[in-house]
């Protein structure tokens, strides 16, 4: 069984207000994407990495991230699509998976603080079950709202905030994405596509520091998290 990390990094980062895409912004002198890839590069149970980025940025990604930082597990840099879901399908089609039971970890390129232990647990669960979704319990009260009016308050104990990685056996996630593409269905995450197949996705406890860096405020948090991580080493 091979374990492959599929890392979508094709977002335009409009909310960041920067001149370059968010995945290439520097965090202590190193692109965010490089911090993320380093986690998979150092994880002994991960065999391969595929990065998905806008087609025009493939040469930049190869030179300034993959080659500059010496990521030996990166097998390919794949052109992304219009939506994240299209990008992931492109990545799945590019993976050299000879066995449908090979495991694929799908992880956002701008989530550099995922603990290795969470990755390992995700692989274990995905191997035994239909899939593994990393998530954390909601801390805040959640409201449903229509036209500016509160319409309900879901029980907080049932609300979990989805993160990545979302991890599946290759045959399951490939089938889910191909079906969604054929039917023109656009989901909010990879797990939702697997759920449409009638499969049961199991939750793996995540980490509240596993943030998706999309705004300037997130960058401030990320800098603080990185200093904390460095001080613990």
Curated annotation (Swiss-Prot):
Question: Is Nucleotidyltransferase there in the keyword field?
Answer: yes
- Enzyme type, top EC level: transferase
Pfam families the record matches: IspD
Question: What's its catalytic activity?
Answer: 2-C-methyl-D-erythritol 4-phosphate + CTP + H(+) = 4-CDP-2-C-methyl-D-erythritol + diphosphate
* InterPro entries (alphabetical): IspD (IPR001228), IspD/TarI (IPR034683), IspD/TarI_cytidylyltransf_bact (IPR050088), ISPD_synthase_CS (IPR018294), Nucleotide-diphossugar_trans (IPR029044)
Q: Which UniProt keywords apply?
A: Isoprene biosynthesis, Nucleotidyltransferase, Transferase
Which PROSITE patterns does the annotation name? ISPD (PS01295)
Q: What is its EC number?
A: 2.7.7.60
Q: Which Gene Ontology BP terms does the record give?
A: isopentenyl diphosphate biosynthetic process, methylerythritol 4-phosphate pathway
Cite the GO molecular-function annotations of the record: 2-C-methyl-D-erythritol 4-phosphate cytidylyltransferase activity
- Give the pathway: Isoprenoid biosynthesis; isopentenyl diphosphate biosynthesis via DXP pathway; isopentenyl diphosphate from 1-deoxy-D-xylulose 5-phosphate: step 2/6
Q: Where is this site: Transition state stabilizer?
A: 15, 22
Site note Positions MEP for the nucleophilic attack, residues: 156, 212
Record flagged with keyword Transcription: no
Q: What's this protein's function? A: Catalyzes the formation of 4-diphosphocytidyl-2-C-methyl-D-erythritol from CTP and 2-C-methyl-D-erythritol 4-phosphate (MEP).
Describe the family membership recorded for this protein in Swiss-Prot or TrEMBL: Belongs to the IspD/TarI cytidylyltransferase family. IspD subfamily.
Return the protein name: 2-C-methyl-D-erythritol 4-phosphate cytidylyltransferase
Gene of this entry: ispD
């Amino acid at each position: 069984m091979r374990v492959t990390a599929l890392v979508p990094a094709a977002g335009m980062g409009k909310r960041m207000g920067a001149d370059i895409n968010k995945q290439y912004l520097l965090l202590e002198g190193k692109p965010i994407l490089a911090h993320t890839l380093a986690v998979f590069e150092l994880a002994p149970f991960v065999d391969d990495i595929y990065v998905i980025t806008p087609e025009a940025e493939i040469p930049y990604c190869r030179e300034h991230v993959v080659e500059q930082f010496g990521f030996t597990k990166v097998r390919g840099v794949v052109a992304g699509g219009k939506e994240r879901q299209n990008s992931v399908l492109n990545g799945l089609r590019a993976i050299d998976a000879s066995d449908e039971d090979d495991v694929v970890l799908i992880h956002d390129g701008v989530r550099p603080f995922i603990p290795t232990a969470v990755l390992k647990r995700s692989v274990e669960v995905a191997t035994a079950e239909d899939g593994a979704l990393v998530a954390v319990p909601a801390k805040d009260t959640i409201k449903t709202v229509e036209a500016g009016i509160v319409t309900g308050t879901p029980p907080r104990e049932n609300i979990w905030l989805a993160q990545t990685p979302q991890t599946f056996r290759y045959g399951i996630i490939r089938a889910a994405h191909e079906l969604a593409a054929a039917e023109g269905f656009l989901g909010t995450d990879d797990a939702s596509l697997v759920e449409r197949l009638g499969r049961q996705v199991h939750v793996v406890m995540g980490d509240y520091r596993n943030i998706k860096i999309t705004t300037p405020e997130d960058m401030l948090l990320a800098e603080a998290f990185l200093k904390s991580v460095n001080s613990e080493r």
